[in-house]
């Protein structure tokens, strides 16, 4: 699972700013021929003297370039949601303009054009905004009963719900810590904050939750929580204990091997013969000749030599024959 990376707004600025005025998009407008976007007033003023895109020089239209530009509401909503305070400042500028110029014709414009749209109506949330939320214990059994029975809320369900007012920038991790300290939940239990039946990430802010789940401000943001044992941590601790014990056993056996006479010899079974297997000579044609290892002569034990004790042995050494008896 890939870790989520949070990036700075400055890294997105090239995609959110108009190259003509150097500011963030206001009334974002896109050229349909090349899909480059600009502020509406900026591109309209530019196309009065040119018929080419100011970025890629593609021809917008031969005679009437304004026919090939479109308002981009989606891009403008993204800019308003990403740039803190931009929407509120723009609405204030428009209200101040029409207050200073009463003769300006704004009758055909929308409420947003006149600056009369509040943040709540546009569903724009700022970091310093206070969000009302409700949080209650998530009970699967109660949820099943609620599906099977009537949807009337009992007094017990109402009393289990708590209401909070928190900054929009507060994260789920902060809410989890608050619940743990408020209810004295030990660290051996895990707290999950949920929206409906879906657990939320620790790095989610209340503003993120409101945007992701399209909170309409028609009531407190409904959140739930559940408490469960930290099974994964317990398993990891057991595995570590097992590895530690195994390491201790191996170290103990290693120390025993170091103190034993065979400590310097590898313990691999494929390298050494078993006690019941006779030691094979490196010279199969002369099984009685001992082999030399590390400058010392190693010969079979007395039990293996007894079968050759009374048998004469003849071997050729340096071209001369030698006969030896047991």
From Swiss-Prot:
A zinc finger (RING-type) spans 18-57. GO terms for biological process: apoptotic signaling pathway; brain development; chromatin remodeling; DNA methylation-dependent constitutive heterochromatin formation; embryonic skeletal system morphogenesis; hemopoiesis; humoral immune response; in utero embryonic development. One of its GO terms (cellular component) is ubiquitin ligase complex. The keyword DNA-binding does not apply. This is Polycomb complex protein BMI-1. SMART domains: RING. The lineage of its organism: Eukaryota, Metazoa, Chordata, Craniata, Vertebrata. A motif (Nuclear localization signal) lies at residues 81-95. It is found in: Nucleus; Cytoplasm. Component of a PRC1-like complex. Identified in a PRC1-like HPRC-H complex with CBX2, CBX4, CBX8, PHC1, PHC2, PHC3 RING1 and RNF2. Interacts with RNF2/RING2. Interacts with RING1. Part of a complex that contains RNF2, UB2D3 and BMI1, where RNF2 and BMI1 form a tight heterodimer, and UB2D3 interacts only with RNF2. The complex composed of RNF2, UB2D3 and BMI1 binds nucleosomes, and has activity only with nucleosomal histone H2A. Interacts with CBX7 and CBX8. Interacts with SPOP. Part of a complex consisting of BMI1, CUL3 and SPOP. Interacts with E4F1. Interacts with PHC2. Induction: Down-regulated by oxidative stress. The gene is BMI1. Residues 236-326 are annotated as: Disordered. May be polyubiquitinated; which does not lead to proteasomal degradation. Monoubiquitinated. Its main location: nucleus. It comes from the Eukaryota. GO terms for molecular function: promoter-specific chromatin binding; RING-like zinc finger domain binding; ubiquitin-protein transferase activator activity; zinc ion binding. It comes from Bos taurus. Residues 162-182 are annotated as: Interaction with PHC2. Component of a Polycomb group (PcG) multiprotein PRC1-like complex, a complex class required to maintain the transcriptionally repressive state of many genes, including Hox genes, throughout development. PcG PRC1 complex acts via chromatin remodeling and modification of histones; it mediates monoubiquitination of histone H2A 'Lys-119', rendering chromatin heritably changed in its expressibility. The complex composed of RNF2, UB2D3 and BMI1 binds nucleosomes, and has activity only with nucleosomal histone H2A. Residues 164-228 are annotated as: Interaction with E4F1.
């Amino acid at each position: 699972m890939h870790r989520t990376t949070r990036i700075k707004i400055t890294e997105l600025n090239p995609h959110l700013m108009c190259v003509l005025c150097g500011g963030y998009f206001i009334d974002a407008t896109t050229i349909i021929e090349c899909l480059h976007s600009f502020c509406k007033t900026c591109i309209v003023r530019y196309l009065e003297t040119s018929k080419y895109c100011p970025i890629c020089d593609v021809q917008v239209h031969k005679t009437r370039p304004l026919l090939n530009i479109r308002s981009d509401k989606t891009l403008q909503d993204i800019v308003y949601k990403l740039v803190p305070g931009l929407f509120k400042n723009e609405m204030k500028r428009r209200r101040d303009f029409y207050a200073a110029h009463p003769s300006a014709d704004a009758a055909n414009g929308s409420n947003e054009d006149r600056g009369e749209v509040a943040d709540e109506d546009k569903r724009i949330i700022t970091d310093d905004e206070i969000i009302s939320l409700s949080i209650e214990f998530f009970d699967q059994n109660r949820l099943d009963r609620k599906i099977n029975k009537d949807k009337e809320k009992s007094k017990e369900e109402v009393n289990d719900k708590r209401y909070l007012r928190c900054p929009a920038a507060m994260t789920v991790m902060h809410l989890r810590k608050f619940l743990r300290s408020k209810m004295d939940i030990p660290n051996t239990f895990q707290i999950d904050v949920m929206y409906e039946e879906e657990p939320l990430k620790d790095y989610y802010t209340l503003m993120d939750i409101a945007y992701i789940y399209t909170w309409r401000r028609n009531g407190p943001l409904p959140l739930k929580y559940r408490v469960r044992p930290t099974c994964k941590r317990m398993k990891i601790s057991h595995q570590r204990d097992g590895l530690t014990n195994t390491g201790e056993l191996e170290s103990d056996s290693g120390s025993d091997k170091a103190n034993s006479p065979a400590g310097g010899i590898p313990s691999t079974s494929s390298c050494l013969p078993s006690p019941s297997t006779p030691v094979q000579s490196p010279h199969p044609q002369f099984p009685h000749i001992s082999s030399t290892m590390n400058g010392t002569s190693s010969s079979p034990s007395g039990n293996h030599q007894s079968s050759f004790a009374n048998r004469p042995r003849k071997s050729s050494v340096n071209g001369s024959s030698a006969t030896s008896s047991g």
